[in-house]
């Protein structure tokens, strides 16, 4: 998504773009907005074709990881490497609607008796928020209109997107797509969102319903076809990324069928190991006080909380460093600002009660006083939530028995493949 924001700014300044580089295998050799996406291993070959190339690192959250990879590829000294990161233009997420129509087990919306307020941001309030973002961060290139909520339920989403685009800022959306849209989806598509992530966890109802509680995968698939139709009808190039959450019960035939559907529709399928959210639940687990829901969910995880932390800790961040805290500002629908996007409870985790009345400096200073951060970093949870050291996660997943009906490995072992 950050690359699409950078693309807008580069085009605005008449700078030529050759390609995108992304380590996610889902994007390899695909096209985004007319530009081919290559694996980092192709960088040397690309650079050797011209002396005019420069590398623009667009993802602030993973900038250190990317620069380390460039050093490992031994090309960091052979080409100019620029950072797109601007301390005065953090990654903004605005949760325009704080409620959701589903109650997925891995998400805090499934937590009963939560005191977190539900509601939506009015169109007028959003305009005030975005105007302040532009004033505080003139170089901002992209914004996400979601955090914990379902933005496609917002009645004025199309107008919100148009308002953001008027300032040449890219828009990212995320949806479960299990929604009866009527004619609203076409209004959203006509607004040309730059990126749309579809979160799901199965192709067949038995798998999907187990982890996306309250959703209907048949409705989701119907909407995927509708989405393709509307994109073509309106000549819109929105990058559609089907973000597939991997569990024990959906990682063979389910994922293969979803990949076939995505190929048919021209969408991307990016796979991610399911995590337990929010941060408070993971810390409770680490303290030896897991709630019943987390205990039940872990039975279906390909990589347990402890395993994920162990794998991610092999690539530790510098001491007292967290990319979520330092590179993001998250704004809730009620205008409160939490310490980061991984927390749920409001209490001491809110660093500003009203974004409109707080400066970036004040927000960042308040973040330094949140005690939860110290414990989170001591437990290596920023690395866990970033999914560092994917090969380590793959290793743990490959040792697990799966329950995806009808799918047995070729050797009959019914263990998870590393593919």
Label for each model-derived stretch:
Residues 1-11, 20:
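Glycine-rich adenosine-cofactor-binding loop
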Residues 7, 67, 130, 158-161, ...:
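Generic structural signal for well-ordered alpha-helices
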Residues 17-31:
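NAD(P)-binding Rossmann-fold cofactor-contacting core
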Residues 27-86:
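Phosphate-bearing ligand-interacting subdomains
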Residues 49, 88-90, 319, 330, ...:
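Flexible mid-to-C-terminal extensions adjoining Fe-S/redox cofactors in radical SAM and related proteins
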Residues 84-195, 206, 210-218, 222, ...:
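Conserved alpha-helical substructure of the radical SAM core
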Residues 136-146, 165-172, 191-200, 218-312, ...:
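Conserved C-terminal portion of the radical SAM core fold
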Residues 322-325:
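Short, small/polar residue-rich loop motifs at catalytic or cofactor-binding pockets
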């Amino acid at each position: 998504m950050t690359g699409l924001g950078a693309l807008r700014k580069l085009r605005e300044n008449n700078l030529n773009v050759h390609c995108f580089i992304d380590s996610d295998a889902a994007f390899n050799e695909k096209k985004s907005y007319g530009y081919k996406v290559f694996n980092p291993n192709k960088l040397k070959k690309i650079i050797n074709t011209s002396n005019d190339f420069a590398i623009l690192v667009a993802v602030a959250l993973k900038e250190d990881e990317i620069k380390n990879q460039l050093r490992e590829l031994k090309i960091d000294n052979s080409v100019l490497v620029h950072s797109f990161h601007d301390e005065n233009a953090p990654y903004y997420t605005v949760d325009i609607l704080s409620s959701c129509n589903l109650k997925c087990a891995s998400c805090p919306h499934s937590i009963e008796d939560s005191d977190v307020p539900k509601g939506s941001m009015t169109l007028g309030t959003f305009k005030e928020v975005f105007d302040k973002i532009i004033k505080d961060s003139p170089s901002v290139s992209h914004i996400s209109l979601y955090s914990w909520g379902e933005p496609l339920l917002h009645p004025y989403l199309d107008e919100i997107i148009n308002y953001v685009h008027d300032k040449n800022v890219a828009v990212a959306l995320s949806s479960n797509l299990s929604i009866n849209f009527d004619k609203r989806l076409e209004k959203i598509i006509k607004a040309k969102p730059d990126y749309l992530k579809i979160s799901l966890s199965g192709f067949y109802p038995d798998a999907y319903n187990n982890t996306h509680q309250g959703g209907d995968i048949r409705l989701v698939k119907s909407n995927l076809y509708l989405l393709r139709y509307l994109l073509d009808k309106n000549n819109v190039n929105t990058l559609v990324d089907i973000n597939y959450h991997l569990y024990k019960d959906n990682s063979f035939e389910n994922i293969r069928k979803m990949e076939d559907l995505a190929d048919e529709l021209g969408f991307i399928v990016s796979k991610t190991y399911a995590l337990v959210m929010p941060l408070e639940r993971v810390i409770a687990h680490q303290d030896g006080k897991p709630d019943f829901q987390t205990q039940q969910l872990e039975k279906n995880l390909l990589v347990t909380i402890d395993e994920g932390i162990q794998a991610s800790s092999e690539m530790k961040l510098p001491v007292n460093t967290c990319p979520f805290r330092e590179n993001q500002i998250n704004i809730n629908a009620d205008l409160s600002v939490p310490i980061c996007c991984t927390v749920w409870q409001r209490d001491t985790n809110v660093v500003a009660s009203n974004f409109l009345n707080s400066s970036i400096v004040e927000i960042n200073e308040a973040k330094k006083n949140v005690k939860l951060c110290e414990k989170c970093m001591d437990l290596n949870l920023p690395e866990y939530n970033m999914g560092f050291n994917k090969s380590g996660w793959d290793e743990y997943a490959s040792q697990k028995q799966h329950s995806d009906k009808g799918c047995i490995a070729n050797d009959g072992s019914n263990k998870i493949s590393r593919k």
